[in-house]
Amino acid sequence: LIQKGLTGDLMKELMTLIHKENIVVQKVPIQKLNHMVKKNHQGIIAMISPVAYHEIDWLVQQVYEKGEDPFILILDRVKDVRNFGAIARTAECFGVHAIVIPSKDSALITNDAVKTSAGALFKIPVCKVTSLTSALDFLKGCGLKVYACSEKSETLIDKLETTGPKALIMGS
């Protein structure tokens, strides 16, 4: 969160870095910042994830090195933190090795997401990628078969042959 109306060379430099890292920015009135924190905020409040993000290439390699078939969940435009947490909780029960999310148009991993996940977000690595298409191409190149969920499908997931390395796409 950045206070509306902040200007200057340092602000320009900060905004350049923010855009380079694909960080979501919201400009808000100073009153909102004052309400959120009681200490000096200098016009900026950063919300950081309670979990660290991982690199997808490293994770897939680690799963293969353990002698397991990767099972990767890809979430496309899941924006509600509680839905994200509930999906992570279910994914952990089904043995998902990692969750892949886009750096834009995705729920942030907040305390609410972690709480709803019942701690699953501390167990399942999350990968944040700039392009889901590139991530899918990478996963296919690693031998994963890709499945996509749709409410319009006539085939139920339990009827699919899902042995071997796989990625499952879910979204809104």
Please state what every model-predicted region is.
Residues 57-65, 138-140, 158-162:
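Short amphipathic alpha-helix with an adjacent loop that forms part of the alpha/beta core around
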Residues 1-64:
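N-terminal positively charged helical leader segments and presequences
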Residues 76-86, 131:
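Amphipathic alpha-helical repeat scaffolds
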Residues 147-172:
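Active-site/ligand-binding-proximal alpha/beta "capping" segment
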Residues 36-49, 117-120, 163-171:
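Short basic, glycine-rich beta-strand/loop surfaces that mediate nucleic-acid
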Residues 97-155:
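Histidine/lysine/aspartate-rich catalytic loop segments that bind and position anionic ligands
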